[in-house]
Amino acid sequence: AMLDFIEITTRRQSLELRMDELAIGDRSPLIGKTLEASEIRQRFGLIIVAVKKDSGKMIFNPAAGYTIESGDKLIALGEEDDVSRLSKECLG
C-alpha cells in the first residue's frame, strides 16, 4: 500500500492528503459499477487518480465510464478518514 502523505499548504491552512491503494474484494458493492455510478467523489470526497489491474497494468486518470472489476486496486487521493471509509466499501 502506498502510504505517501502529501501536504498542501494554502493561505494559513494546511491540508493533509493521503494517497492509498485500495483493493476491490470479491464482495464489494462497487463491482460492475462505473466510476461515475459509484459516486466515489460525491460520497467520499476522493479522487481516483489511477486503477491498477490484476495484470499490473496501470490506468492513469481513468474515465468516468471505467467499470470497476474484482481484483482492481483503486489509487485514491483524499483525506485519511475518507480513504478509510472507501477502503471498507472496496473490501465488501
Predicted regions and their residues:
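Anionic-ligand-binding alpha/beta catalytic cores of soluble enzymes and soluble regulatory domains
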Residues: 1-19, 23
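Cytosolic Rossmann-like ligand/nucleotide-binding regulatory domains
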Residues: 21, 25-92
